[in-house]
Amino acid sequence: MSDQSRVMKVLAALLVSMTTGAFVLMALGNNPPSAGAFCLSSYYSLGPVKEAILSRACQSPDRWNRIEIYYSGTGAGNIEYLASLQGLTRPEDLNYHYVICNGFGGLDGEVQPTERWQKQTSSTPDRSWHGSTATIRICVIAPGINAHPTNCQVKRTEALVDGLCRVFGIQPQSIYYPGDWL
């Protein structure tokens, strides 16, 4: 007898909660939920960040001790576009290790390792950067002044940074983001 009473209580509670939920949804009107920050299907169609961390050259665990993320200053781009924009004859001459695309020139959030990363060579200090030979440079395609990176770029950059920190033992205080990073 107590089992039947318990079943009735559970069914009544279920009916009340479903009815309440239906009234709440009707009160909200015909406004569908806003689109998410990014489409998960496009996010998962990108290559794994783990693959981008691998390189053709041998990787020493103590080779890198710092990460710098900065904006390209452009609204679109990829490795080839940035090389031509900088007047370089070959994309291999870019002075950073990774490019994170924004959907204009490459898939949104696409992580493109440069030849510098593949060969495990250091960036060369220039007028815009004065890092050390143990700094990994990540270029995020974004103007950076009034336009910020896409949410997908932010998530993929953070995933890349986390992976690099794990592989090379880089400490959080050795990661430098742009001042207006989200």
Task: Please report, for each region that a protein language model flagged, where it lies by residue.
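Catalytic cores and adjacent binding grooves of peptidoglycan-active enzymes
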Residues: 172-182
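N-terminal Lys/Arg-rich, disordered targeting/topogenic segments
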Residues: 1-7
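Hydrophobic membrane-insertion alpha-helices, especially the h-region
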Residues: 9-27
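Active-site-adjacent loop/helix surface patches within enzyme catalytic domains
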Residues: 31-60, 66-173
